[in-house]
């Protein structure tokens, strides 16, 4: 049986929500602008699917050029949707730590080129164990904390240690490091004096 889909010409007031409604001319213009920005550079774009939500739109953007040929998805469930829709490369820029989700991650890695971020030796070993059992390879990128306090290593030594472990274990492909845009402000002197945690965020030359 075919899945129900709203027909062309359905009134906006009759559409179920949530519903993706696009101005295709504006979408095409935006994709062209992004493609033109990146296509002649060494830096390529990996669109985050929280912006587009749809494998069809991801394919449209990839065809425009200027991308790495894949997307970024916040969690395993979103990555599954993208791979099911034919996207060949997915980066998950967060840690995947529970046994069940690591298994789903590894199953996905058997269908597409999948990279996930890590910030602990324990997580790296868990992913390696499950990936090896399923005879797949999972890409590993070390997340670097850039003062967002969301995750990531906070020292060069920690990052080097995790990288060396990842390079030694089976079932893994070490891909490098990843970080979010740095979050720096200019705190007042008294804030430094009274907040040791704040002081630890800043390195002065």
Kindly give the residue locations of the regions a language model identified:
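Active-site beta-loop-alpha junctions enriched in small/polar residues
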Residues: 52-54, 74-77, 95-97, 119-123, ...
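Short helix-capping segments at alpha-helix termini
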Residues: 40-41, 65, 132-137, 167-172
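A charged N-terminal "starter" segment
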Residues: 1-107
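Aromatic/hydrophobic pocket-lining residues that form the small-molecule binding cavity
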Residues: 27, 31, 54, 75, ...
């Amino acid at each position: 049986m075919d899945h129900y889909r709203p027909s062309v010409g359905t009134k906006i007031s009759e559409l179920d929500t949530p519903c993706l409604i696009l101005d295709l001319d504006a979408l095409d213009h935006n994709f062209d602008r992004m493609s033109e920005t990146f296509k002649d550079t060494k830096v390529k774009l990996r669109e985050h699917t929280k912006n587009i939500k749809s494998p069809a739109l991801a394919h449209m953007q990839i065809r425009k050029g200027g991308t790495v040929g894949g997307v970024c998805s916040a969690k395993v469930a979103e990555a599954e949707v993208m791979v099911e829709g034919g996207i060949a490369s997915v980066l998950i820029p967060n840690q995947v730590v529970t046994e069940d989700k690591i298994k789903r991650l590894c199953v996905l890695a058997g269908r597409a080129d999948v990279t996930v971020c890590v910030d602990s030796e324990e997580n790296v070993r868990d992913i390696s164990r499950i990936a090896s059992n399923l005879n797949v390879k999972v890409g590993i990128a070390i997340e670097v904390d850039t003062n967002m306090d969301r995750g990531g290593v906070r020292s060069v030594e920690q990052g080097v240690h995790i990288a060396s472990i990842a390079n030694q274990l089976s079932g893994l492909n070490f891909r490098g490091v990843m970080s979010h845009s740095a979050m720096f402000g200019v705190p007042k002197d008294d804030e430094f004096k009274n907040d040791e945690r704040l002081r630890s965020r800043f390195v002065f030359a």
